[in-house]
Amino acid sequence: MFTRDMTIASFDPDLWTAMQGETQRQEEHIELIASENYTSPRVMEAQGSALTNKYAEGYPNKRYYGGCEYVDVVEQLAIDRAKELFGADYANVQPHSGSQANAAVYMALCKPGDVILGMSLAHGGHLTHGASVSFSGRIYKAVQYGLNPETGEIDYEEVAKLARENKPKMIVAGFSAYSRVIDWERFRAIADEVGAYLFVDMAHIAGLVAAGVYPSPVQIADVTTTTTHKTLGGPRGGLILAKANEELEKKLNFAVFPESQGGPLMHVIAAKAVCFKEAMTDEFKQYQAQVVKNARVMADTFIQRGYDIVSGGTDDHLFLVDLIKKDITGKDADAALGRANITVNKNAVPNDPRSPFVTSGLRIGTPAITRRGMGEVEAKELTDWICDVLDDIENEETIQRVKQQVLELCKKFPVYKG
């Protein structure tokens, strides 16, 4: 029998200590990993609810288990809100992650061995866009496009050329490390020319799209997927969206359940519903606009301090710092900044001469610092501190000075007040 006063702290102190350590780390470190964000206590409340106890294979009003009358309401709320938020005609809120959402799209629309055309991981794409180590590059014949070496932007002429030569079943647009606005209509035209599906993975920019500060692909692509964390700031999970197409909707639903997943995570779906409602507020729209402003200030400050930024700037929430000319590895830069309580991630830059485990760049994003309430003043200040460390990554005195400055800034802008 359970009682409401049961706690992890009293039952499992080892686990509790690690959990509290992570909470403290989040409060005392500056988070600049582009794919990370802080979620609201409301989202966490939903994830810790009794909904975690309920099995609900199937879809609302079409379940394989009894007792689903309340989880049906929960899932339908999430579906309806996702459709309203993104202007979609169809939404599936069951994918456990962005990668699983992508896998379901491939299974719904492609057969093993079909050609897919996606952005190279080395140029800013995602593992699931055809990387050789991913299922997407093993089950399907993946052809990869990249960036124009002169501009650092997507080479649409190359995309069109590869599409004409390889006749892909599906063209994948989207990224995990790209700082410019993608021309969705250009991709649509290329896909139509060769008779391919257009699949957009907007996992990184979904919050920006929801707020109207980045163009929406939802009514342009055949299918769009996203995660519900990152810029959306919700729970860790996936989402599939599409414009009206009854045959396509049936294929997508089947690909999620029963083809690739069993029971949905109802507590996470409830948290997605909360997240979608939060994203409809004016406060959220203002937040997303500030995310972009902060990213631009940071990119501009790096350039002023003598650092190269891939494509020369940013139009979204992230950018890549190219450290090749500085003769610093991404791995060493990541480690030095970590000692100063600044969390970034090493990242390959286009045509990177170093291995993916070392790299020559850093990926930096602003969703988390903006969520804490930081604006352009703090963004510039932070960038100057980062550059101070990178200018001499062996200087522990500078690292410790910056760490103290970071701790003071974190106290001023707590993640969770009270």
Curated annotation (Swiss-Prot):
It is found in: Cytoplasm. The keyword Membrane does not apply. Signal peptide: none annotated. Pathway: One-carbon metabolism; tetrahydrofolate interconversion; Amino-acid biosynthesis; glycine biosynthesis; glycine from L-serine: step 1/1. (6S)-5,6,7,8-tetrahydrofolate binds at L121, G125, H126, L127, S355, P356, F357. The record marks H229 as: Plays an important role in substrate specificity. It catalyses: (6R)-5,10-methylene-5,6,7,8-tetrahydrofolate + glycine + H2O = (6S)-5,6,7,8-tetrahydrofolate + L-serine. GO terms for molecular function: glycine hydroxymethyltransferase activity; pyridoxal phosphate binding. One of its GO terms (cellular component) is cytosol. It comes from the Bacteria. Keywords: Amino-acid biosynthesis, Cytoplasm, One-carbon metabolism, Pyridoxal phosphate, Transferase. The modification N6-(pyridoxal phosphate)lysine is found at K230. GO terms for biological process: glycine biosynthetic process from serine; tetrahydrofolate interconversion. Transmembrane segments: none annotated. Its EC number is 2.1.2.1. Its cofactor is pyridoxal 5'-phosphate. Catalyzes the reversible interconversion of serine and glycine with tetrahydrofolate (THF) serving as the one-carbon carrier. This reaction serves as the major source of one-carbon groups required for the biosynthesis of purines, thymidylate, methionine, and other important biomolecules. Also exhibits THF-independent aldolase activity toward beta-hydroxyamino acids, producing glycine and aldehydes, via a retro-aldol mechanism. Belongs to the SHMT family. Homodimer. This is Serine hydroxymethyltransferase 2. It comes from Hahella chejuensis (strain KCTC 2396). The lineage of its organism: Bacteria, Pseudomonadati, Pseudomonadota, Gammaproteobacteria, Oceanospirillales.
